[in-house]
Amino acid sequence: MIELALSAAVMVACLSGTVQFGYTFYIYNQLVTAVGNGGRYAAMRTYRAAAPRDIEQGKAAIRNMVVYGDARPGVGTGPQVANLKPEQVQVDWAMDESGKPSAVNVTIVGYTVDAAFGMIRFSGKPAVEYPFVGRYAPAETEQ
């Protein structure tokens, strides 16, 4: 009986660790997919920069694409990844020497996976960088 109790405790610990590890990888894979889709969207969209407000509105649309899968989500739309918020998506533009965007970086910062036996925090990962292939429109405004 003692052997059964000891081996059952070890087996339960191994099983629960495997479940937590698998769930964390499942969430991470969802984050990778969302960040990749948002990065591709950002790389192909029109970069409008008539005012600083236009740049920030463009970044908000990219963050919404990562979180909700839509640049303009409807009321009540839930996130693609559990508990992901637009504030946890960082969008940075790399500019060339003439001031035009050359690449876009999309990163997750401060996201916590609330697994069964602990919390795992992702900051700076996953991240993607795509070259900018969209249209540069410095005189246009976001709508």
Task: Say what each PLM segment does.
Residues 1-23:
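N-terminal single-pass transmembrane signal-anchor helix
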Residues 10, 27, 44:
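Active-site-proximal flexible loops/turns
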Residues 24-32:
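Membrane-proximal amphipathic alpha-helices
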Residues 33, 37-143:
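Short, conserved structural patches
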